[in-house]
Amino acid sequence: LERYNGPVLFEAPAAAEILAQQFAPRLLAFREPVSDDPRFDLFIGQTMSQMGLGSFADRLGSRVLPDFLDVTDDPRPRDFRGAPLLGGQAVDDDGVVPRATLLVERGVLRALLATRVPARGAPRSTGSRREWGGPAPSNLVVAATRSAGEAQLRRDLLERARARGLDHAVVVRRVGPAAASTALSRLAAQMGGGAEPGGSALAEVWRVFADGREELLRGVEIAEMPPAAFKDIAAAGDRPAVWSGEFMMGAAHGLGPGASVGSEQPVVSCVAPALLFEELSLVGARGPFPAPPVTPSPLAGR
């Protein structure tokens, strides 16, 4: 795959992971540091922009998702339909008891996650200060008021691809770790190829055809994922899945305001259905790729 511009279907676990990586950091409220050094201010501004921090501070009351999606951060539940949720906590690092916070209602941004440090768009704490020193989600739950089954999502995906003159579409089943994504992006950009910094490496990507054929693609990254990509989500599935992992924002993009060297990354959980994006730009990472072993492992088949 050299480049693909078209509809992309993220199956449920991958959809939850990409939301945790690319959408959740925009839901955090930060107060920008004030200094008398314009170079420091420029550095902090560029860092926060790259991380997406503060990008929704001026978007309260504006649409950031389609009108059939709601997003809630809720530290209280321990599981979702039997799958454990690992992001909950009884009290945050500021000593504030966290509560369920409706962040996005019918696609409209209603609130941001905040600490006790006042910030634009967040006049009070939501009990979200976590290990890394700043706000972070706990259990992020994405709910769809309008959903479709797996077969319908696949048909919709292929129809949208056909309308663009494409003979295939793309399905993402696993997303790579955020830290690896950013490292790969920066390395590729420095070497003159691949995605620009800020993209996400995708661990398992398939090219799908109308006749049912599927081809595995290697070394695929999202070139960029602007906020508009989330507004243009076309459909959602009817079977939510859980993804849990480290909230790698600080480690992947550089330390954000309030983070400290050596600070731990909080564990978060995200619940989301499959999501059909109207349009994303994917690029193939340039090789060389590691070759498979010449002989099979002696442990193979055991």
Predicted features, each with a name:
Residues G45-R302:
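Dual-mode signal for accessory low-complexity, basic/Gly-rich regions
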Residues L1-S55, R59, R63-D67, R110-A111, ...:
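Internal alpha/beta scaffold segment
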